[in-house]
From Swiss-Prot:
Complexes and interactors: Part of the 30S ribosomal subunit. Contacts protein S5. The interaction surface between S4 and S5 is involved in control of translational fidelity.
Pfam families for this protein: S4 (PF01479)
SMART domains in UniProt: Ribosomal_S4 (SM01390), S4 (SM00363)
InterPro entries according to UniProt: Ribosomal_uS4, Ribosomal_uS4_arc, Ribosomal_uS4_euk/arc, Ribosomal_uS4_N, S4_RNA-bd, S4_RNA-bd_sf
Protein name: Small ribosomal subunit protein uS4
PANTHER family xrefs: 30S 40S RIBOSOMAL PROTEIN (PTHR11831), 40S RIBOSOMAL PROTEIN S9 (PTHR11831:SF5)
Presence of keyword RNA-binding: yes
Record keywords: Ribonucleoprotein, Ribosomal protein, RNA-binding, rRNA-binding
Source organism of the structure: Natronomonas pharaonis (strain ATCC 35678 / DSM 2160 / CIP 103997 / JCM 8858 / NBRC 14720 / NCIMB 2260 / Gabara)
Similarity field: Belongs to the universal ribosomal protein uS4 family.
Length: 174
């Protein structure tokens, strides 16, 4: 493939119009402050890849979950590190994940849940404008996947006007 080839990181729905799916997508877009359905489809594709890998690992172990867990220990460790799985979860639990589990790990959602914005949209704006840091580094991508270890390190940039507790745009809870 040539350099700079256009590749999509998501799959679109098979059927262009299904009223129930469209309504569900609209609800998720408003609840998580997503700008367009491409962001949702990207999360769904990521979840699909996780489930595909879990099925492959379980299949290679012929249904033996202990052997599958040994083979997929790195895969499980990665999902536990980013907070999609809990410490006691196994490969079988990956198959029961939902797209909301992926969307909850986005920087935009974590910043909103921490109270850095009054709405998910406001948290997204603060991130995009460079007001939020993770581990002291400015991150301007709302789709950044937050590790469990980084969750406590999300805060306003000290040079940002929003770092002042009395700033009018700060969340009321702080």
């Amino acid at each position: 493939m040539a350099l700079g080839s256009n590749t999509k990181f998501y799959e679109t729905p098979n059927h262009p119009f299904q009223g129930e799916r469209i309504a569900e997508e609209g609800d998720l877009l408003s609840r998580y402050g997503l700008v367009n359905k491409e962001e949702l489809w990207r999360a769904q594709s990521e979840l699909r890849d996780y489930r595909r890998e879990a099925r492959r690992l379980i299949g290679e172990a012929q249904g033996d979950t202990v052997a599958a867990a040994e083979a997929g220990s790195e895969f499980l460790a990665r999902l536990k590190r980013i907070g999609v799985l809990d410490d006691e979860d196994s490969l079988d639990d990956i198959l029961s994940l939902d797209v909301t589990d992926i969307l909850e790990r986005r920087l935009q959602t974590v910043a909103y849940r921490k109270g850095l914005g009054n709405t998910p949209q406001q948290a997204r704006q603060f991130i995009a404008h460079g007001h939020v840091t993770v581990n002291g580094a400015r991150v301007s991508a709302p789709s950044y996947k937050v590790d469990v270890a980084e969750e406590g390190e999300i805060e306003f940039d000290e040079t940002s006007p929003l770092a002042d507790d009395l700033h009018p745009e700060r969340a009321e809870g702080q």
